[in-house]
Amino acid sequence: MILSTFENNNKSANVCKIAGEYEVMFYKDNSYLNSQVALTEQQAENIAEDWVLNANII
C-alpha cells in the first residue's frame, strides 16, 4: 500500500507499507531503481525526501 509519494524533476519515491514493513521505492525517469526498508514511516519519508531533493543519494 502506497502511503505517500515524493517527486522532484525526474525523480520520485513511494513510501509503502508491505507486509508490516515500511519500504521506500526509488524511481528515476519513471523507471524503478531500487528500494530500501525503513524502521518507521517517518524514517521512510525522510529517506524518500532526501532522494528526490539530492542528486548524490543511491
Task: Spell out what each predicted region is.
Residues 4, 33-34:
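Short beta-strand segments
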Residues 12, 32-33:
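Short, mixed charged/polar active-site loops
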Residues 1-25:
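Short N-terminal "domain-start" leader segments
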Residues 26-31, 37-58:
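A short, charged, amphipathic alpha-helix used as a generic interaction element across diverse proteins
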